[in-house]
Design a protein with these regions (language model features):
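P-loop (Walker A) phosphate-binding loop of NTP-binding proteins
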Residues: 10
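Post-Walker A helix-loop "phosphate-sensing" segment adjacent to the P-loop in P-loop NTPases
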Residues: 24-33
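Walker A/P-loop
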Residues: 16
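ATP-dependent small-molecule kinase phosphotransfer cores
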Residues: 33-81, 85-92, 117, 125, ...
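NTP-dependent small-molecule kinase module
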Residues: 21, 25, 96, 134-166
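ATP-binding Walker
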Residues: 13
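Hydrophobic anchor at the beta1->P-loop junction of P-loop NTPases
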Residues: 7
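A glycine- and Lys/Arg-enriched "phosphate-lid" helix/loop adjacent to the NTP-binding pocket
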Residues: 93-137
Length: 166
């Protein structure tokens, strides 16, 4: 498999967990975009947000979408990576974009206590729910395949693999 598989979706939808299972299933590499950005920027995501701002972070995401896609494999994107049209276009050029559609309440339960997510700490459940709804339309518009995120990681990965192999 030479083309990249970009997994997108809201924070806590299962991109990281499903991504690892999917990479094993496809016999390819797995990479996490946030970890890639932290390594290339030599600082944590919360540090980037506080020291350099969200716009700088979004620029780093654009570079990551382009650079990571050259290597193929399964890439778990940050929750906001597909917000920029350019990122979605680059991802579609380099591979296939898959949206893991997980209900907000499930995402919230997974992320509500995560100190490494600056956007969670700065918002209420309700305001993040509004953000979820706004982003859902973008994820849907930019993905080649949408998978139900309520199954087990292996079930979700199997559905994605079936789509990829078509």
């Amino acid at each position: 498999m030479s083309r990249a598989v970009y997994l997108c979706g809201f924070m806590g939808c299962g991109k990281t967990t499903v991504g690892r299972v999917l990479a094993d299933l496809l016999g390819t590499a797995y990479a996490d975009m946030d970890a890639y950005i932290e390594k290339s920027e030599k600082m944590s995501i919360p540090q980037i947000f506080s020291d350099k701002g969200e716009e700088y972070f979004r620029d780093a995401e654009t570079r990551a979408v382009e650079e990571m896609g050259k290597n193929g494999g399964v890439i778990a994107c940050g929750g906001g990576a597909m917000l920029r049209e350019k990122n979605a276009d680059l991802a579609a050029e380099n591979g296939v974009v898959v949206y893991i559609d997980t209900p907000y309440d499930i995402c919230w339960e997974r992320i509500k206590d995560d100190a490494n997510r600056p956007i969670v700490a700065a918002n209420t459940k309700e305001s993040l729910g509004e953000l979820y709804e706004k982003r859902k339309a973008l994820y849907t518009a930019h993905s080649a395949f949408m998978v139900d995120g309520t199954g087990s990681p292996s079930q979700i990965a199997a559905q994605i693999a079936e789509f990829i192999k078509k």
